[in-house]
């Protein structure tokens, strides 16, 4: 299955002990057990992880910095996701950058 292939690929990558991971939508096609295991491995990962995700719960659990790319610039913030989405400074920046 697609999820099994993703799990194998992620396991193979993590065993190589990289210091940077660049991953796009890593939780797609994974079941809850695999997402939890991957989440825990990212929390313990000592390197840098750049990821794109639409999974808010996943972002909240692993991200300590959020960089939002907009049509007119970027918003770079060292906030957990749940604080990022309600932060007044971020909301003001988003309003300006999405016009």
Placement of each model-derived feature along the sequence:
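ABC ATP-binding cassette signature C-motif
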Residues: 1-99
């Amino acid at each position: 299955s697609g999820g099994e292939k993703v799990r194998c690929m992620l396991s193979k990558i993590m065993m190589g002990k990289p210091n940077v991971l660049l991953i796009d939508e890593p939780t797609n096609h994974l079941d809850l057990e695999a997402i939890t295991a991957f989440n825990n491995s990212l929390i313990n990962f000592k390197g840098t992880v750049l990821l794109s995700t639409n999974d808010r719960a996943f972002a909240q659990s692993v991200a300590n910095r959020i960089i939002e790319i907009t049509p007119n610039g970027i918003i770079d913030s060292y906030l957990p996701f749940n604080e990022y989405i309600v932060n007044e400074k971020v909301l003001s920046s988003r309003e300006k950058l999405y016009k």
